[in-house]
Amino acid sequence: MDLELTAEQKMIVKAASEVAKDFDPEYWRNKDKNHEFPEDFWKALVDAGFVGIVIPEKYGGGGMGMFEMILAMETLTSESCGLAGEWFLCLTSVFGGLSVLKHGNELQKDNYLPRICKGMEFCLGLTEPDAGSNTLNIQTAAVETGDEYVINGRKTLISGADRAKGMLLVTRTTPLEKAPKRTLGLSLFLVDMPNQAVEVTPIEKHGINYSKTCDVYITDLRVPRENLLGEKDKGWYLVLDTLNPERMSFSAAAAGLGLLAIKKAVEHAKQRKVFGAPIGSYQALQFPLAEAKAKIEAARLLNYKAAWLYDRGLPCGAEANMAKVVAVEAGIQAVYHAMQTFGGYGYAVDYDVERWWREVNLTRLAPVTHQMALSFIGEHVLGLPKSY
């Protein structure tokens, strides 16, 4: 693994930095306050080619890999965009683009990938009220009827479902009690949205208010058989393949948010004087920021390794989960101590740190909880007994 970025990768970083300049913290402050989708930001991501980075050139994409996607996400996030720098790319490019690219047939690729490159928004219909971390407990049922499937069920906490033109929907095609093994019986479908059989209800939430997260109610949704992604009953393995790049994306977001907060805290700590000296000269403020910076850089390297392995088709679950554990804790530490550096201003909306605090804490809960990532490391890296 060469740590020197190629000329092409450096161009990705530069282009992401240029895009971020047009969307400063005030822009995001207003979008979050007014619960407005950032239409012009999404258009900028599409026009710059970031949405199609991982999609082959023959479909209109950049023909690059997850490593380059991570660079774009991290740069957009750390330059000024906060979690939005990763959020929309993960929803569409990872959930939609990578899933279709890796597991779709040629007709599905021809149908969806060019449209994704042009800005077709996607969402992932995975989580259910009784199936969060326990994905195998999914109850949304898809019943085969002739040349189509009829789907009924409920999903929750589905981000982007209100705007998505496509949903990767995780269903159960064989009841759990009838499946030959627990990991069989799930199937994935590509669903065109919006759809009269799919009711979408936004959930009021703590942050990221420029993107809606929704309850989704599915009633007699009819999906053609040709919209089945991969093999029937083997969707669990496709879900697993999506989870690693999802974790890498959120690691990039946590690291990027941490870097953004540290940068702003350092600027303030150099200018703000208390007792006749810049507050940055006091170890109580300086050392926590320095420690967070060191941890973030370590997390970035581990995340790069995970993406490098993924792009070569090598096992990367250990690296992806460890990167998320380290990046999230470092990012939260960085934003927390940035807030302490700003003092009372850190709690004020106009200084943005409180928004980054609301955003970075999501990375500890999603796309997998901190505890589930640690469980993976304990069981699959250390070889300890299953802990749940």
What are these regions (language model features)?
Residues 1-83, 90, 103-108, 115-119, ...:
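Alpha-helical interface subdomain recognition
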Residues 49, 72-77, 171-173, 191-196, ...:
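Short Ser/Thr-interspersed hydrophobic loop/turn segments at strand-loop and sheet-helix junctions
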Residues 64, 134-136, 160-165, 180-184, ...:
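Short glycine/proline-enriched turns and hinge-like loops at secondary-structure junctions
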Residues 93-103:
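Helix-loop "lid/cap" segments that line or gate small-molecule binding pockets
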Residues 118-127, 170:
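A short, Trp-centered hydrophobic/proline-enriched beta-strand micro-motif
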Residues 137-139, 194-224:
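Flexible, small-/acidic-enriched active-site or ligand-binding loops
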Residues 148, 152-201:
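A short core secondary-structure module
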Residues 214-241:
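A short, charged helix-loop
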